[in-house]
Swiss-Prot record:
GO CC terms in record: nuclear speck; spliceosomal complex
Record-linked SMART domains: RRM
Knockout consequences: No visible phenotype under normal growth conditions.
Function: Required for constitutive and alternative pre-mRNA splicing.
Residue ranges occupied by any RRM domain in the UniProt entry: 2-74, 93-164
Family statement: Belongs to the splicing factor SR family. RS subfamily.
Name of the featured protein: Serine/arginine-rich splicing factor RS31
Length: 264
């Protein structure tokens, strides 16, 4: 079964997104998600050829990136379930894991899945993929070979070496621990993902709502000074009103007081 290579899609693209796209051209056996690319396996190669013709350079995703769709070269002819690591990736202590259920799967589930093969020093989940760091590269290699195409919570996962070790990032961040040095990356990367989709409405909506309660006062009365001037007369009027409210009753009381003095 010859796989179809798919590249240049957005980083947050999920396996189900590609399955829905390619299923229009024939029955898809499976989709293997990698780091920034994927392999799509059709049951019929004629359907795969049709998908390549129709989807190569096709605008896809929120950013309308042009997909790169062609017959896979390095993976062509590889039997299903082969756990061999991609030849173009340098072995590292950190593994890239994808295809697990992003809603149900937690960090402790992934750690429990990989810890039989060596000491796991760090696990980080980023949306629909994860990084698993081992104490040694040998343990990472052993885990990769043992867990490729294995299941985490009934989902078959794809495992490969990460492009760079966490230790290399630590060096750039002053030698801090993996969890600390990588946490800023975690905060930076999801932010564009989170803000990119809702931005047409969300980016504009909060500021008018936030400023609406105050801005009319400043707009109508020409700035803060005028706003304060507007408040001062109100305060004065309230004071005079208070005096006027008391004076009628007070006067009536005084008007009645002379009556007893006028009795014989």
């Amino acid at each position: 079964m010859r796989p179809v290579f798919v590249g240049n899609f957005e980083y947050e693209t999920r396996q189900s997104d590609l399955e829905r796209l390619f299923d229009k051209y024939g029955r898809v056996d499976r989709v293997d998600m990698k780091s920034g690319y994927a392999f799509v396996y059709f049951e019929d190669e004629r359907d795969a050829e049709d998908a390549i013709r129709k989807l190569d350079n096709f605008p896809f995703g929120y950013e309308k990136r042009r997909l790169s769709v062609e017959w896979a070269k390095g993976e062509r002819g590889r039997p299903r379930g082969d756990a061999k690591a991609p030849s173009n990736l340098k072995p590292t202590k950190t593994l890239f894991v994808i295809n697990f259920d992003p809603i149900r799967t937690k960090e402790h589930d992934i750690e429990k899945h990989f810890e039989p093969y060596g000491k796991v020093t760090n696990v980080r989940i980023r949306r629909n993929f994860s990084f698993v760091q081992f104490e040694t590269q040998e343990d990472a290699t052993k885990a990769l070979e043992a867990t490729q195409r294995s299941k985490i919570l009934d989902r078959v996962v794809s495992v490969e070496y990460a492009l760079k070790d966490d230790d290399e990032r630590d060096d750039r961040n002053g030698g801090r621990s993996p969890r600390r040095s990588l946490s800023p990356v975690y905060r930076r990367r999801p932010s564009p993902d989170y803000g990119r989709r809702p931005s047409p409405g969300q980016g504009r909506r909060p500021s008018p709502d936030y400023g609406r309660a105050r801005s009319p006062e400043y707009d109508r009365y020409k700035g803060p000074a005028a706003y304060e001037r507007r408040r001062s007369p109100d305060y004065g009027r309230r004071s005079s009103d208070y005096g006027r409210q008391r004076s009628p009753g007070y006067d009536r009381y005084r008007s009645r007081s002379p009556v007893p003095r006028g009795r014989p």
